[in-house]
Structures are given as structure tokens and as C-alpha cells.
């Protein structure tokens, strides 16, 4: 598509708004016939004359003589037999009967055929044609002839056969006798037969009753055909059975005419006495016939007769009578239902509803105005057309002038025919020759309709008709419309069937008959699609075809005949400049259907008239608009109001183009392009999606629209008309013609206002003086700009129709099968306006084209892209662009690659597809395409194509421009991320074995590495970050650390930190202690953890230690996001390990020195120790809470619902407090001071307190109260919980942990005395305390060192004030004996390399003397001296022998063993 023909959607949208408004006004301008008749009551001239200088409005097309065989038969009968005639337009046949013979012949062309049917013996008295009900006869029988004789009713089948070319379905007919479908008339002579569009047959008898003829296939005893009387009561039926009709002498008023309103399901009947009856047959036309109204005095309702009885009798011969009745279609009127033509030329319009009107026509809701018939009343009377006004062929005036003075100048109508707005009267008032008066709607007055109110508006809405008079030979017998051809009818039906404004509702009627109703509308709005109307008149002398010239036909004749310019100007004046220009445009573009082709001369003259400023005018400003806007409602001037700017009035050429375009698009614009077809035999409730319009209808409309667009383009290229006027404006031309400028308004509505006739100069509204914003040249350029927008709209509309035809040819139902439910619903609701003008319509069209391409490029091989793409590129290039062509070529290559087994060829074909797509990255459907590349394992395209599309979507890099608004940046980044997600999905597929079960691990790793390599090489910073996040999410940390780019560390730092300053502390290697305790979420922790692993892998141990420390000390953002203490311990342990590795590493310059200087290792180890205390405190608190809760539960079960005592309540409170403290201590790291003061001491965790005091290197006097009190509380706590054994166990556990100490943390004197006293007290009561328990516990606390324990006992025994009690002293001496023995055994075991247990056996066994030499002499002396000293001390005690002898003997035995001659 060249630049000149390129469609700018902004222009299309602007023109679409303008044309949409025009279409809305077109629909609103259509008046109901009742409103037009009401307005015409106040008009002085309801009839107009056709200009004599113009070509005739109605002309005789052809005349035919009656078939010779018919004339011969009639002459043979001597002119006295029974003869009837009529026309069956449904089968294109005229008919006539002579006695018992029926003749049928073609009335619209001469084919020489006139078949005769004479199967009856009696004369035919009534004839009718009915549609054949389905399922009764064979398919070949389409219609039934209904023949009534005085004695029988006969059905005859009619078979229609199409011609050789297949275009004429009624080329030949044959009649098929049906002998089983003949019944007796029961002596009733039928006067007329009428049939409904659903095949029901009604007959009127001379007895005044209405009958229905029913027929079925027949089964069993049932008759195949029967006659039912619908209007007679029970009494009348019995009377008929008993007394034959010939013996009834009462007055009978037979029905002479019946007509059916198939839209409202009403049957009207007219009797000889001018009585009208109305019957209804149910809402669907299949119910029983029911009389709803009967009116005898219709002529009196409108004062048709005046005066007394005598004058009425005297003037009885002049009283008008009803000549004919005809139903009015709903297209003509919703409130008027029947028109009756009178013998004096007047018309009565009747309604069957008692309610009034008062509604307007709209696009929808047409059926809502149907009301149940309940009466027959005259609503309006139309005066008779004046004699002599019709000048169709110039005979009317002459016929009036030829009458004598005594002749009655009133009309004498013999027969009348009314159909869709046209009335044909046979006037026998002329003395010499009868004439036909044809009354039709005058189209010219519609161009004068205004929007103002008052008398002028009423006059513009009044019904005006033009009268034409034609002479005829003989009498008019029957008139019928010549229906459009089947092809034309099918096209019109498809276009207008769902447009209720036009009322083309088939409802069982043939397309031809239903579409003929459009003639009721103005010729101006339908002449572009409807052919010339034709009627055929059956007279006693032959047949005559009358052709109605449309306004465009008259204009064509004027242009063909080289008429004076004044006639052309008169034509423009009569129809209005806009309407006349529209007709010129139709002729110039050749979009009107004619029987013959439009000559080039006529087309050129029409184009010249369309562009002639002397005829269509020039665009100008409304000089009175600014002034008129200053007037107030009262008619004066308001000095306080701002004078509005003058509005431009475009030329008639622009107005004509708008009218022509809106009428072409009218049946499409606001209606959906698709519909759902449902059938009873399908189980689906959704139905099948099909194109609403037929392919032939869309083709017809497309050709018309393309012809119009082609004409406008040629005038632009040739610089004709206004195009030539604006050609000299230089650079302004480009912006005017192609929309590249920015001066046309900020929004679409403003642009439409500027382009299509509502100007505002903006910014200067304070100036109250009227001003002209544009020069005449600029104003002309603006009109050209507006016309160019409409041209682009036409081109886009033609392309949309072409696309719809293509979709229909490929079966839309099949194409939409794969669409999701939401897209299907959007497609069904999509209007043509949206398809042409909206982005949504463009997207849906793209999706449908994609479905067509998938049909061709599918694996089953229906074709290639080049099989269908040329049609798309030529027919709808704005929907199928060059980029789309390359895209589908790539898709075709992908399909071929998928079917190729050779690996090298597969890769080459895939690379070809990648090459195509790389040229059009912005138009590719990446979701589908990249998935196909994934299946081919061609991951280069999977990575590169989304990155190219991301760049195409955001070429300026708005996502990274901090100078732009945040919403713009976010939108650009969101578009990029949609592309990135495709690459991430490919990674997910590879990372999940379930998604790719056939892929081995080696290949999986290879492809993942390939994607990562390609991604890291990208210059798109946002994508690399997105890739890193996706890899972390997929647990591809190892691959990320191995192949990550140089920006991986900054990415991890930024992702884990809240600010750049925090990242700087870590990245530079400095200690991040100033940031300890920073709030970090679990997601951020992932990045820090990965950063630490990265540092470890790169042997940057100091940085890794800092990151692990930061992870251990982090504070949670939310309560549930807090890491456990065990996790913190793991992180700190890792930090200690990395610090140790750094101190042992010689590879990093300055690392060991940095650790030595900062004491990082000591710091980390100290933090780890404090964390261990914290974990212990938490566990203790949880245990305390659990114990208290168990205690409370046991008390509750024991008390069985009694009120809790105070202790139970305290336990509950303690349990709650312990739980709260446990949760608090688990939330974050605490200092050793906090742990000691806030948790350990309040909950009496004395053991942990001692450990923390030892860890803190607590120093003080030996009598330090804190140490002593803590130990005392710990021992008391143990004693209360488990007695001496528990206290000894605690002493062993705690003492061994903190020994060796400086005597402050482990005060042996205090512990010894405290335990010995407790043991003495408890042994005297209930507890069994062994002598060695305390001594061995003290020895264990000192890690087996006996001397410190012995020294403690020495100090106690030497101070009588401290240990005054003999019992306590003997208790201490027993413990001393245990200490000395243990000391001796430990010395022996050290020398012999045996355990202390075995040493005790040796020392007291048979080998004691032999092994004593192994004892250390120094230790032996100390032990011996102590034993001698304590033996003396035992003797000094004032205690009974039974308490001292054993102790004394022990010391003595020990001493003797040490003093043996075999001593070492």
C-alpha cells in the first residue's frame, strides 16, 4: 500500500463518528405515515406536479397482448361465459379463466408459453395461489392452485423449474393434478380466495361466511382435505345441514374481497354492502380465526354523507363506495393498518387499535408496538387527487379540457390498487377514454425537512404526493408489483432483514415480496440499492408494464439529453444541493443499478456537476450563526453572553458524500457482523457463529463502496474540484490530506468538530466579537481534509467487507472453534462500526486472520501462506499488513520444521522463520510462536524475539527514563515484562521435569545455559534483572552463580537492600555492623543468601562473612516473616566459618590483616555464643510454659469444674508470661545484658545466668555477692527440685563448664559448705545421702582436680566459727576422705594408664603392694600428710565412737597404704 492509500486510523475514527451521526439522523428522520397524514391536514397542497420539462416520472415499459389461446377460448364462449383474471407475482405469472379452463403465462417477458388446465367440469368461480405447507407433498410442488367451482374445491400442484443459467427460478412451471385433494363445496359458491404466507387458505362464500381449506398427508380414516366454516355459529351450522342453501331466502351480504396482513396476522374482509370485518389468527398466524371488529358505517365516520334522509335517498347514486382495501405494512406505519380506496378517489386510513400513537422510529424496538386488534376505526382521510394535475404523459389536462360543462368533474374510480406507498386508480370519468391515475410519494420534499418547530416543521413533515395520469384502452382489471429478481431480493434481505427501521421481516414471505416493502421508504434513501419499481396492469385489452423513475434516473436523463443548465439547477433546487450532489456522486462512481450501463459521458457530466462550485457551492461560514447565537429566548440581545464563533458550512459536495456514505453503510453500521445460529437438533446452547450477511450481499456492497472510494481517489490524484483548490497550499497539503499535522485537535471529538462543521477557535472566548478562524483557502482545505477522512473510512469499510467474505468462505464456525468463550462473545457482539474504527475490532480481525492462516499452515497441509496471502494483501491491506505476511511465512516455516526429522534441516528452517520474525518483531504473536520455537529447541529465537519486541514496544526507553511520569514508566515497563515473561516461561518449562519429560538432564542443563548465556549478553538491564529473578524463583541458583553477568552482584545487593547506601557498605567490603538489625523480608533474604554464596564461590570470605552476619541479625518486617533462632545460628556459624577461612587464606591480599585488625572472628564467635544462650533461654521458657500449662490442666481435671484456687490462676499467668517471653526472645537477636536482666533472672534461670557471667568474664572479690547468690539460688533450686543428688548433678554440669576459673565464678568454699549443710540436714530427716556424693560432685566440677577441693575443705575445717557443729565437721571429714581416695586413685591411673575404676581395684586388692611404687612421691606425701592431720581432727571431735571410728579407720588405712615399704 502506497503512502497515498495508507489508512490512518485516527482519520477513520473521526469520519466514523460523523457518519454515525448521519446514520442516526437518517433513522430519526423517517416518519410514520400517521404523523405525515396528520401534518398534511394543515397543508394547503397535499399533491404536487411533476415538472413538465423533466423526463417523465412514470413511463410505460412494455405492453403485451393477451395470449391468443386465451382470446380464442373467450371468443369461442361467445363472450358470455364465466371469465376471471389476475396476477400471481410470486411465480411471475398472470392467469385468466374461461369457464372451466385456467390459463397461466409469463407477464414480465415473452416466452410464448401459456399452459392450460381444464380438469374441472364446472366453471371456475374463484382462484388463489398458496404456498405449499412443508411435509405434505413432494418437494417439487412448491405452490398450490386453489380452484373453486360451484360444486367442488380443487387443489392443483404447481412446480417451478429454473432456467438453464440458474438465475431465473420461475423459468418454467407445470401443474400437477392432485385428485385426492378435491372436496365438495356443499353448494356454496366461493367469491374470492386468499392465502397467508404460511400456507393457510381462506375462502369467502356467497353465503357471507369465510371458510378455511385444510389439507394433510392423510392417514387412516381421516380425509386428506376438508373445508371448515370459520364464521358461522352452531345454529347456523345446523341450519345449513338441515336446509340447503337454495331454500334460504334471507338477505345475504357476501364477501367480495379478502386481504391478509401477514405481519400483524389480521384478515380483512369487504362485503358487497361495504361492511368491513377484521379477524385475527393468533400471534404466529396458526391459531383459529377470531373476529375482532366489524364496521358497517365507515363512510359516516368522517361525515362522508350529510343531510336528511330525503337528500340521502336522492343522492344515493352519488354516494361513494369502497373500491378496494389493502393492508399497510409496518414499515409504512405502526398505528395505521388498513387503507380503503373510495370510488371518488379518496382514501380512508383505518386502525385496529383504539390506543393512539406518539412514538418515534428507532433502530430497535420495532416489534414492541404491535397491539392486539380490537376495533376498526377511521383515523385519517386523504382527499382525492385533483383532475388534470398528473402530467406523467401529458394526457391529464387534455382529458379535463375535453369535457363538456354538464359532465361531472368528480372521479369515478372503478378499480384501485394500493401497495407500499403507491396508489393506482382506474378513472372512468373521462367520456372518451379511461385513464390511470398513479399517486406516489414525492421524494423531493424530504430534502427540505428542517429541524425547527412550528408551522414550517409541520409542513416539512406533511405527506406530499405526486400524481401522474396515463391513458389506457379498456378497463383496468388487476394490478400487481413486479417483484425484484431473486438475486437482488436475497441481497436486500440479507442487508436489511435485521434492521427493524426498514421492516424487512420475512416471516414466511418470499424474499422478493418482503424486500419490495422497502419501496415504501423514500427513493432517496433506497435508490442506491433498489432497482426501479415496476408494476404490471392487467386490462381488458392486454397488459402494460409501468416503470417508476427514481430521482437518480431523472438526473441521468437530464445529463444524457444535454438539457439546459437551468434544468440541472432546477433539479438541485427541488431536491436540495446535498441530495442532488449525492445522486451526481452515485452516477459518477457508477454505484447505481441500471438496466443498462452508465455511459462515460453521463459519468463525466455527473462528476463535473459534483465538483462545480456554481452548483454545489463553496465551503463558507454561516454569517448568521454568530449573530443568532446572541439572541436570548425572549428575542432580545443579552449583552452579558459571549458571542459564539461562526460555524463553517461545507459545500453540497461534502454533504452529498456524507449522505451517500451513510446510506451505503446504514444497514451495517450499528449491527453485529456475526450472529449465532441455533437449531432444534443441536444440543449446544451457544449455537453456531456465522456471518450475519450473506457473501453475495457483502460483495455487492463492497463493490459499491470501492467504486465510490475509487472515484474520490481519482479526483484527488487528478486534483479536481476542491482538491485542485488546495493543491497550492504547500506544506499544509500534507497535513490536510494525510493527517500528519497536529493542528486538528487534541481529541477525536474535537477533531470531528473541526473537520465536520463545528468550529471553535479556542483560547479567545473572552472576545465577544465574531471572528473567522480560517481564510477561504484554509476552509476549502479543511473540507478536503474531511472528505479525505471519509474516503479512508470507505476504503477501510470495503476492506472489512472483503475480510468478512473471506471468513465466511472459510466457514466462520470452524475458524472460531479454538477461540475462548470471552473472545467468541466479543466477536458475536462486535458491530461493523467497531470492526472498522476501533482497536478492539482490529484485534479481533487479526485473531480471525490468524485462524485462517492456521487453517492453511496446519499440519494437515491444506495449502501454503502464499495461497491466501495475496488475496488478503490485495483485499484488506489495512487488516493484513506486510508485517503480518512475514509473520505467517515464519509460522509456515515453523510448521515445516516441526514435520522435519533431519536435525540440520530442522535448524535451518527454524532459522529462516527466526529471520522473518526478526524483521517484524512488533507484530509477532510471541506466545504462540516462541512456544513453537521451544518445541524445536531453537532457544535463540525464544530469547531474541521477545527482546526485540520489547525494544519495539518501547523504542525510546521510557521504562528507564526517570524524567517521565511514573504512570508512563510503569506502562512501558509492563509492556516489556510481558515479553520477558515468555523467556521466563521457557526457563520454567526446562526447569520442570514434568513439563519436558522426554528431555534428559544433560540436554536440559545445556538449554538452560544457552538461555542464560543469551540473556546475559543482552543490553536490556531490565531484562537481565527479570532473568535473575526468574532463575532464583526456579531454584537455578547454581546456574545463576556460574553464568551470571557482571551486574549480578549489584542486582543481588539492590534486590536485598532498601537503599543504595546499604548496598555500598557490603559491596565495598567494609563492616556492615552499623546496619545490623536492618529490616529484611524473606524475599530479600533470598538475595542476600545468594550473594553470600556468590562471595564464597569467588573466595571472598570476608564479604561472605559480612553478608551471613547481616542475615543472622536481620529483623523481620512482619511477625510471620521472622527467621528462627536456629536459622540465625546457622547463618552465624557460616559467618564464623568464612571468617576463619579468611584468616587462613593467603590468596586475598590484606584479608588476614583485615580480620586481625577488626577482630571480626572474635566478634562473630562472641555473637554465636550469645545466640546459644538465647536458644537455651527460649527452650527453658517454653518448657516452663509447658509445665505450668500441664499443671493447670491436671488441676482442672481434679477439681471437675470447681472454681480455680489462687495457685492455679498464678500458674496460668506464669504460663502466659513464659509463652510471651519465649515468642519475644525468638523474634530477634538480643544482647547478653538483655538476656541476663530481662529473661534469665526474672524466670530464675540461674544455670544460664552463671554461664553468661562466666562468658562475660565477670570479675570481682571472692566474696562477690552476685556470684555467691546466684550459686546459692541455683543450688537451692536444685535441692527443691531433686534433693542432694539433683544439686550435685547441677554442680557437676555447671562447674565443669566454667572451671578452671579464678575462684570467683566457682566459689568452692561456699558451694561445699552449702551442700554439706544441706546433706546433713536432709540425712537426718528423710533423704538418704551418701558420703561420696558431694565430694565427687565437687571433684567433677573441678574436672577431677582434687587439690582445689581439698583446699576448700581445709579452709572450712580450720575455721571453727564457720563449722562449729561436730556433726557437720564429721560430715566434712567423710567428704575429705573421699577426696583423698579419689586423688590417690587418679594419680595411680595416670601413672599406669588405667581408668580410675581399675585403679581403685588395684589399690584395695592383692596387687596393691606391688603397684604402690607407681605412685608419685609428691602426691603421696600430700595425701599422707592430709590423712594424718585429719585422723587427729577426727579424734578431737566430741562424738560417739560409732560416728568417728569408721572415718578414723579410713584415714588410717589410707595412710598405712601410703607408708608401706613398697611405696614408690
Swiss-Prot record:
Residues with PTM N-acetylserine: 2
InterPro entries per UniProt: Nucleoporin_Nup133/Nup155_C, Nucleoporin_Nup133/Nup155_N, Nucleoporin_Nup155, Nucleoporin_Nup155_C_1, Nucleoporin_Nup155_C_2, Nucleoporin_Nup155_C_3
Entry keyword Acetylation: yes
UniProt xrefs under Gene3D superfamilies: 1.20.58.1780, Nucleoporin, helical C-terminal domain, Nucleoporin, helical domain, central subdomain, Nucleoporin, helical domain, N-terminal subdomain
Primary localization class, coarse: nucleus
A cellular-component GO term for this protein: nuclear pore
Keyword Transport: yes
PANTHER family listed in its UniProt record: NUCLEAR PORE COMPLEX PROTEIN NUP155
Primary role: Major component of the nuclear pore complex (NPC).
Protein family per UniProt: Belongs to the non-repetitive/WGA-negative nucleoporin family.
Protein name in UniProt: Nuclear pore complex protein NUP155
Originating organism: Arabidopsis thaliana
Lineage: Eukaryota, Viridiplantae, Streptophyta, Embryophyta, Tracheophyta
Gene giving rise to this polypeptide: NUP155
Amino acid at each position: 500500500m502506497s503512502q497515498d492509500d495508507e489508512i490512518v486510523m485516527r482519520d477513520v475514527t473521526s469520519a466514523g463518528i460523523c457518519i454515525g451521526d448521519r446514520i442516526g439522523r437518517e433513522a430519526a428522520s423517517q416518519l410514520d405515515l400517521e404523523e405525515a397524514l396528520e401534518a398534511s391536514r394543515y397543508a394547503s397542497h397535499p399533491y404536487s406536479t411533476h415538472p413538465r420539462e423533466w423526463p417523465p416520472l412514470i413511463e410505460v415499459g412494455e405492453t403485451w397482448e393477451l395470449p391468443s389461446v386465451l382470446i380464442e377460448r373467450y371468443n369461442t364462449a361467445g363472450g358470455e361465459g364465466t371469465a376471471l383474471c389476475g396476477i400471481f407475482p410470486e411465480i411471475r405469472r398472470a392467469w385468466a379463466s374461461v369457464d372451466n379452463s385456467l390459463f397461466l403465462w409469463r407477464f414480465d417477458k415473452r416466452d410464448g408459453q401459456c399452459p392450460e388446465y381444464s380438469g374441472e367440469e364446472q366453471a371456475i368461480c374463484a382462484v388463489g395461489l398458496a404456498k405449499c405447507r412443508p411435509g405434505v407433498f413432494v418437494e417439487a410442488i412448491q405452490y398450490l392452485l386453489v380452484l373453486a367451482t360451484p360444486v367442488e374445491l380443487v387443489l392443483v400442484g404447481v412446480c417451478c423449474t429454473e432456467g438453464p443459467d440458474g438465475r431465473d427460478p420461475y423459468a418454467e412451471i407445470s401443474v400437477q393434478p392432485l385428485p385426492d385433494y378435491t372436496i365438495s363445496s356443499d353448494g356454496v359458491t366461493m367469491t374470492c380466495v386468499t392465502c397467508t404466507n404460511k400456507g393457510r387458505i381462506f375462502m369467502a362464500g356467497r353465503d357471507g361466511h369465510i371458510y378455511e381449506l385444510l389439507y394433510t398427508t392423510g392417514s387412516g380414516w381421516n380425509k386428506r382435505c376438508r373445508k371448515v366454516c370459520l364464521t358461522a355459529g352452531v345454529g347456523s351450522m345446523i341450519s345449513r345441514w338441515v336446509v340447503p342453501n337454495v331454500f334460504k331466502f334471507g338477505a345475504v351480504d357476501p364477501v367480495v374481497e379478502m386481504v391478509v396482513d401477514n405481519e400483524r396476522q389480521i384478515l380483512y374482509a369487504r362485503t358487497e354492502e361495504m361492511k368491513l370485518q377484521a379477524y385475527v389468527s393468533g400471534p404466529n398466524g396458526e391459531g383459529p380465526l377470531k373476529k375482532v371488529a366489524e364496521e358497517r358505517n365507515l363512510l359516516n365516520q368522517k361525515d362522508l354523507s350529510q343531510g336528511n334522509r330525503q337528500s340521502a335517498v336522492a343522492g344515493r347514486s352519488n354516494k361513494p363506495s369502497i373500491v378496494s382495501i389493502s393492508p399497510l405494512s409496518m414499515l409504512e406505519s405502526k398505528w395505521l393498518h388498513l387503507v380503503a380506496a373510495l370510488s371518488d378517489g379518496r382514501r380512508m386510513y383505518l386502525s385496529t387499535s383504539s390506543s393512539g400513537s406518539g412514538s418515534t422510529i428507532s433502530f430497535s424496538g420495532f416489534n414492541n408496538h404491535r397491539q392486539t386488534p380490537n376495533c376498526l376505526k377511521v383515523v385519517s382521510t386523504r382527499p382525492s387527487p385533483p383532475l388534470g394535475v398528473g402530467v406523467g404523459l401529458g394526457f391529464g389536462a387534455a382529458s379535463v379540457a375535453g369535457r363538456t360543462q354538464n359532465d361531472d368533474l368528480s372521479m369515478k374510480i372503478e378499480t384501485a390498487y394500493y401497495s407500499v406507498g403507491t396508489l393506482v386508480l382506474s378513472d372512468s370519468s373521462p367520456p372518451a377514454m379511461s385513464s390511470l391515475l398513479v399517486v406516489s410519494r414525492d421524494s423531493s420534499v424530504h430534502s427540505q425537512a428542517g429541524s425547527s418547530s412550528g408551522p414550517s416543521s409541520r409542513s416539512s413533515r406533511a405527506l406530499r404526493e405526486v400524481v401522474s395520469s396515463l391513458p389506457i384502452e379498456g378497463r383496468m382489471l388487476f394490478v400487481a408489483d413486479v417483484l425484484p429478481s431473486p438475486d437482488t431480493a436475497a441481497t436486500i434481505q440479507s442487508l436489511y432483514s435485521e434492521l427493524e427501521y426498514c421492516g424487512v421481516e420475512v416471516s414466511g414471505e418470499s424474499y422478493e415480496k418482503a424486500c419490495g416493502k422497502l419501496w415504501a421508504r423514500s427513493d432517496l434513501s433506497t435508490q442506491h440499492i433498489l432497482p426501479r419499481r415496476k408494476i404490471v396492469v392487467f386490462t381488458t385489452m392486454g397488459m402494460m408494464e409501468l416503470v417508476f423513475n427514481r430521482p437518480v434516473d431523472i438526473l441521468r436523463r437530464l445529463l444524457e439529453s444535454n438539457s439546459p443548465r437551468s434544468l440541472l439547477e432546477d433539479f438541485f433546487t427541488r431536491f436540495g444541493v446535498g441530495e442532488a450532489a449525492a445522486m451526481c456522486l452515485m452516477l459518477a462512481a457508477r454505484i447505481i443499478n441500471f438496466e443498462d450501463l452508465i455511459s462515460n459521458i453521463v459519468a463525466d457530466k455527473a462528476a463535473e456537476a459534483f465538483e462545480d462550485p456554481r452548483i454545489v457551492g463553496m465551503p463558507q461560514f454561516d454569517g448568521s450563526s454568530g449573530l443568532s447565537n446572541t439572541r436570548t429566548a425572549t428575542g432580545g440581545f443579552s449583552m452579558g453572553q459571549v458571542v459564539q464563533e461562526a460555524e463553517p458550512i461545507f459545500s453540497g459536495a461534502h454533504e452529498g458524500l456524507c449522505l451517500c456514505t451513510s446510506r451505503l453503510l446504514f444497514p451495517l453500521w450499528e449491527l453485529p457482523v456475526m450472529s449465532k445460529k441455533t437449531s432444534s437438533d443441536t444440543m449446544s446452547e451457544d449455537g453456531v457463529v456465522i456471518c450475519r450477511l450473506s457473501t453475495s450481499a457483502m460483495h455487492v456492497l463492497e463493490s459499491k463502496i470501492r467504486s465510490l472510494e475509487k472515484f474520490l481517489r481519482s479526483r484527488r490524484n487528478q486534483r479536481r474540484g476542491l482538491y485542485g483548490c488546495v493543491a497550492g497550499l504547500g506544506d499544509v497539503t500534507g497535513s490536510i490530506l494525510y493527517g500528519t499535522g497536529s493542528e486538528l485537535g487534541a481529541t477525536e471529538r474535537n477533531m470531528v468538530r473541526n473537520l465536520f462543521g463545528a468550529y471553535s477557535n479556542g483560547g479567545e472566548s473572552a472576545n465577544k466579537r465574531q471572528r473567522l478562524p480560517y481564510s477561504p483557502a484554509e476552509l476549502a482545505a479543511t473540507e478536503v481534509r474531511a472528505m479525505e477522512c471519509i474516503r479512508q473510512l470507505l476504503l477501510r469499510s470495503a476492506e472489512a467487507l472483503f475480510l468478512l467474505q473471506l471468513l465466511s468462505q472459510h466457514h466462520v464456525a470452524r475458524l472460531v472453534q479454538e477461540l475462548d468463550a470471552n473472545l467468541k462473545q466479543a466477536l458475536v457482539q462486535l458491530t461493523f462500526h467497531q470492526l472498522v474504527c476501533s482497536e478492539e475490532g482490529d484485534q479481533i480481525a487479526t485473531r480471525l486472520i490468524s485462524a485462517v492462516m492456521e487453517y492453511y499452515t496446519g499440519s494437515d497441509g491444506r495449502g501454503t501462506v502464499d495461497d491466501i496471502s495475496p488475496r488478503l494483501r490485495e483485499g484488506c491491506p489495512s487488516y493484513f499488513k506486510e508485517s503480518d505476511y512475514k509473520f505467517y511465512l515464519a509460522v509456515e516455516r515453523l510448521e515445516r520444521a516441526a514435520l522435519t526429522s533431519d536435525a540440520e534441516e530442522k535448524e535451518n528452517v527454524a532459522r529462516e522463520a527466526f529471520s522473518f520474525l526478526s524483521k517484524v518483531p512488533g507484530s509477532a504473536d510471541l506466545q504462540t510462536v516462541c512456544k513453537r520455537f521451544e518445541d524445536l529447541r531453537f532457544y535463540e529465537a525464544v530469547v531474541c524475539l521477545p527482546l526485540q519486541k520489547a525494544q519495539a514496544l518501547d523504542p525510546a526507553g521510557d521504562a528507564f527514563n526517570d524524567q517521565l511520569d511514573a504512570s508512563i514508566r510503569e506502562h512501558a515497563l509492563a509492556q516489556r515484562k510481558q515479553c520477558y515473561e515468555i523467556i521466563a516461561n521457557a526457563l520454567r518449562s526446562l526447569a520442570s521435569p514434568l513439563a519436558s519429560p522426554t528431555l534428559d538432564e544433560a540436554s536440559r542443563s545445556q538449554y538452560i545455559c544457552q538461555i542464560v548465556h543469551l540473556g546475559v549478553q543482552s543490553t536490556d538491564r531490565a531484562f537481565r534483572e527479570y532473568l535473575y529473578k526468574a532463575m532464583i524463583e526456579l531454584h537455578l541458583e547454581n546456574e545463576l552463580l556460574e553464568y551470571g553477568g557482571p551486574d549480578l552482584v549489584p542486582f543481588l545487593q539492590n534486590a536485598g537492600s532498601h537503599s543504595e547506601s546499604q548496598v555500598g557498605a557490603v559491596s565495598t567490603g567494609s563492616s556492615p555492623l552499623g546496619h545490623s538489625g536492618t529490616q529484611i523480608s524473606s524475599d530479600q533474604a533470598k538475595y542476600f543468601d545468594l550473594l553470600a554464596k556468590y562471595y564464597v564461590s569467588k573466595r571472598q570470605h570476608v564479604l561472605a562473612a559480612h553478608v551471613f552476619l547481616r542475615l543472622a541479625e536481620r529483623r523481620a518486617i512482619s511477625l510471620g516473616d521472622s527467621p528462627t533462632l536456629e536459622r540465625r545460628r546457622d547463618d552465624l556459624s557460616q559467618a564464623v566459618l568464612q571468617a576463619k577461612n579468611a584468616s587462613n587464606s593467603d590468596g586475598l591480599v590484606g584479608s588476614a590483616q583485615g580480620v586481625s585488625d577488626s577482630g571480626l572472628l572474635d566478634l562473630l564467635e562472641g555473637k554465636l555464643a550469645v545466640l546459644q544462650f538465647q536458644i537455651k533461654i527460649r527452650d527453658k521458657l517454653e518448657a516452663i510454659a509447658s509445665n505450668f500449662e500441664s499443671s493447670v490442666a491436671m488441676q482442672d481435671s481434679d477439681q471437675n469444674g470447681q472454681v480455680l484456687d489462687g495457685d492455679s490462676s498464678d500458674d496460668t499467668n506464669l504460663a502466659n508470661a513464659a509463652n510471651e517471653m519465649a515468642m519475644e526472645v525468638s523474634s530477634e537477636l538480643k544482647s547478653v545484658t538483655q538476656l541476663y536482666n530481662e529473661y534469665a533472672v526474672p524466670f530464675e534461670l540461674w544455670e544460664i545466668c552463671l554461664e553468661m557471667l562466666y562468658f562475660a568474664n565477670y570479675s570481682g572479690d571472692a566474696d562477690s555477692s552476685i556470684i555467691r547468690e546466684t550459686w546459692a539460688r541455683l543450688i537451692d533450686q536444685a535441692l527443691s527440685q531433686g534433693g542432694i543428688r539433683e544439686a550435685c548433678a547441677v554442680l557437676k554440669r555447671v562447674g565443669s563448664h566454667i572451671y578452671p576459673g579464678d575462684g570467683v565464678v566457682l566459689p568452692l568454699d561456699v558451694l561445699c559448705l552449702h551442700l554439706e549443710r544441706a546433706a546433713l540436714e536432709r540425712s537426718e530427716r528423710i533423704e538418704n545421702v551418701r558420703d561420696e556424693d558431694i565430694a565427687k560432685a565437687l571433684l567433677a566440677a573441678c574436672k577431677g582436680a582434687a587439690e582445689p577441693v581439698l583446699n576448700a575443705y581445709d579452709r572450712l575445717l580450720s575455721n571453727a566459727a564457720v563449722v562449729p557443729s561436730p556433726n557437720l565437721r564429721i560430715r566434712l571429714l567423710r567428704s575429705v576422705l573421699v577426696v583423698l581416695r579419689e586423688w590417690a586413685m587418679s594419680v595411680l591411673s595416670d601413672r599406669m594408664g588405667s581408668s580410675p575404676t581399675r585403679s581403685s581395684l588395684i589399690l584395695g586388692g592383692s596387687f596393691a603392694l606391688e603397684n604402690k611404687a607407681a605412685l608419685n612421691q609428691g602426691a603421696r606425701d600430700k595425701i599422707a600428710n592430709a590423712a594424718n592431720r585429719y585422723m587427729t581432727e577426727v579424734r578431737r571431735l566430741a562424738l560417739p565412737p560409732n560416728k568417728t571410728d569408721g572415718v578414723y579407720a579410713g584415714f588410717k588405712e589410707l595412710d598405712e597404704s601410703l607408708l608401706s615399704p613398697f611405696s614408690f
